[in-house]
């Protein structure tokens, strides 16, 4: 496989990030969206075939696509992933992998049955300060981890949800799935799996606009005995304020901050200094709102290397499943309090 051929299902905003990287690392053969104008526009822009149904895409492009990028609404990830896997494609699925634990399991099982790879997007892992702190933890520089604080203070105004699948229970799933699943992933990746949660959530500024919470406070207990809290909201006035992770350890304290975990704001580590961090990529800017750091280049570079050189996968589906399990655990606890 010299040139990796790609397809994209879903031509919304995030699909553009994928298309840019596909042009760098492979070839975009076809795109699909139920809104003809979106599919046609992307098809013309990237000189590829365009379709308005997944069925037609998979039928007419049979054998032409090596990897299908799933950029459709969260609640459709399972269906589109399984259809692409059954058609003989490897799959790269946008976050979250799905919005139920059972759906994730079915997707992983189908990938195994089809003997195909299922890649997940975990872009915040590639933020330079995040990668540096993860390395320090793995090397034991912070010693035993005592506690953590994850702060997610973003803004999503009414326009963000207007005439969109975003904000709906069936297709969006919740604020932790769409806005902050990358942040939850880092807790699992850097600190460990979570044993117990307690939480309070509420919809304070988006009543009648979204089907779920816009704010939450979560208390965590990890299996390794560390404890922590998550304080999240999309009600930061007018703009994103902060996306930060503070870690308190036996031998050090660090805070990764900025608006989207893009700055090493504080460090005090025994006999160790994190320095000379490379400049990270800019955040995904969608005009009316800003997302996480745009690290899709690193995701695609690894994906192509996995398929062409046999290197290890950086973001596998099992770890994406863990993120969904943690969010599911939080939401289940929140429902008990309602």
Predicted region positions:
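C-terminal helix-rich "cap/oligomerization" subdomain common to oxidoreductases
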Residues: 1, 56, 67-70, 223, ...
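N-terminal Rossmann-like dinucleotide-binding module
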Residues: 1-46, 63, 336
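Beta-loop-alpha module in the N-terminal Rossmann-like domain of NAD(P)-dependent dehydrogenases
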Residues: 18, 46-110
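Hydrophobic residues in well-ordered beta-strands that form the structural core
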Residues: 52, 93, 118-120, 230, ...
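Rossmann-fold dehydrogenase core element
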Residues: 106-123, 143-150
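Predominantly a Rossmann-like dinucleotide-binding segment in NAD(P)-dependent oxidoreductases
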Residues: 124-209
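Contiguous beta-strand/loop segments that form the cofactor/metal-binding neighborhood of enzyme cores
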Residues: 178, 184-263, 297-310
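Active-site loop of classical SDR/Rossmann-like NAD(P)-dependent oxidoreductases
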Residues: 287-301
């Amino acid at each position: 496989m010299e040139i990796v051929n790609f397809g994209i299902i879903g031509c919304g905003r995030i699909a553009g990030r994928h298309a840019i990287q596909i042009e760098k690392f492979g070839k975009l053969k076809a795109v699909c969206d139920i809104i003809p104008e979106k599919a046609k526009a992307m098809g013309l822009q990237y000189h590829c075939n365009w379709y308005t149904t997944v069925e037609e895409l998979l039928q007419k492009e049979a054998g032409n696509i090596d990897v299908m990028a799933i950029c459709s609404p969260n609640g459709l990830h399972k269906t589109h992933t399984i259809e692409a896997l059954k058609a003989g494609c490897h799959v790269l699925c946008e976050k979250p992998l799905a919005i139920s634990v059972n759906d994730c399991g079915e997707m992983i099982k189908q990938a195994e049955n089809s003997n195909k790879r299922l890649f997940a997007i975990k872009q915040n892992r590639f933020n330079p300060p995040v990668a540096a702190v993860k390395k320090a933890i793995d090397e034991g520089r912070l010693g035993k981890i005592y506690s953590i604080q994850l702060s997610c203070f973003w803004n999503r105004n009414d326009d963000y949800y207007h005439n969109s699948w975003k904000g709906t229970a069936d297709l969006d799933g919740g604020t932790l799935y769409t806005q902050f699943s990358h942040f939850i992933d880092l807790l699992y990746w850097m600190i460990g799996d979570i044993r117990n949660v307690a939480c309070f959530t509420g919809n304070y500024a988006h009543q009648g606009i979204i089907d779920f919470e816009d704010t939450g406070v979560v208390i965590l207990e990890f299996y390794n005995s560390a404890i922590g809290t998550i304080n999240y909201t999309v009600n930061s006035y007018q703009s994103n304020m902060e996306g930060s992770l503070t870690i308190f350890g036996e031998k050090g304290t660090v805070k990764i901050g900025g608006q989207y975990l893009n700055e090493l704001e504080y460090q005090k580590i025994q006999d160790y200094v994190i320095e000379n961090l490379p400049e990270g990529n800019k955040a995904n800017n969608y005009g009316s709102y800003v997302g996480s750091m745009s690290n899709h280049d690193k995701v695609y570079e690894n994906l192509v290397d996995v398929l062409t050189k046999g290197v290890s996968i950086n973001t596998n589906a099992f770890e994406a499943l863990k993120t969904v399990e943690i969010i599911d655990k939080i939401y289940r606890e929140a429902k008990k309090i309602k």
